[in-house]
A protein has these predicted regions:
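OB-fold and OB-like single-stranded nucleic-acid-recognition modules
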Residues: 1-185
């Protein structure tokens, strides 16, 4: 038995059976048992979800399955889904650094084979919650690169990340037009 204070948001409204998980559990005690089964009790602050099958009702896309296969806890997107159209903040921290670490250790050829060939702006703007974790190839012009130092000791220890770069990229629109503002009928 794993006791935790939070579960993936999708699990709150459905029965969960056979879903792969990962958790850092502290052993509490040996619980009840018999000759066929022994119960172990663990406490954990968080349970990570590593789904293996897409499920539109649970917002699990093929892209999230690919990330989960690399060890990325896709439940970390739960708080991010509510923060679209806002700056990156502390609430995005764990998901952000796990994404950097996961993509950083992945095989480049495997990533390229799963990537969408170009960034399609329409779905990113219209329905960003369905795009989280989508792997895309970004073609554009780098206008500025800023080195961001990471001072968090736990990020250094867990992921080996002491810096990253923030690159401002201009993406060519080609024949596409982007309309900002309200659409009148």
């Amino acid at each position: 038995v794993l006791c935790c204070r939070e579960i993936p948001a999708a699990w709150e409204s459905t029965e969960v059976l056979g879903e792969p998980i990962i958790a850092y559990g502290l052993f509490l005690k040996l619980g009840e048992g018999n000759a066929e089964r022994t119960e172990f009790a663990f406490a954990s602050p968080h349970i990570g979800w590593l789904p293996t099958q897409p499920n539109a009702a649970l917002r699990i896309t093929p892209d999230l399955i690919d990330l989960a296969s690399l060890g990325m806890d896709v439940s970390l997107f739960d708080p991010v889904r509510h923060l679209n159209r806002k700056p990156i903040t502390q609430a995005d921290r764990e998901c952000f650094y796990q994404l950097l670490a996961t993509v950083g250790k992945a095989d480049v050829h495997a990533i390229q084979s799963h990537a969408t060939p170009t960034v399609d702006l329409a779905p990113l703007l219209q329905d960003p919650t369905q795009q989280h974790g989508r792997l895309m190839i970004v073609h554009g012009t780098a206008r500025r690169a800023i080195k961001i130092l990471v001072d968090d000791k736990d990020i250094h220890e867990r992921f080996g990340i002491d810096h990253y770069y923030q690159i401002d990229v201009f993406i060519p629109l080609g024949d596409h037009a982007v309309r900002l503002g309200k659409q009148t009928e």
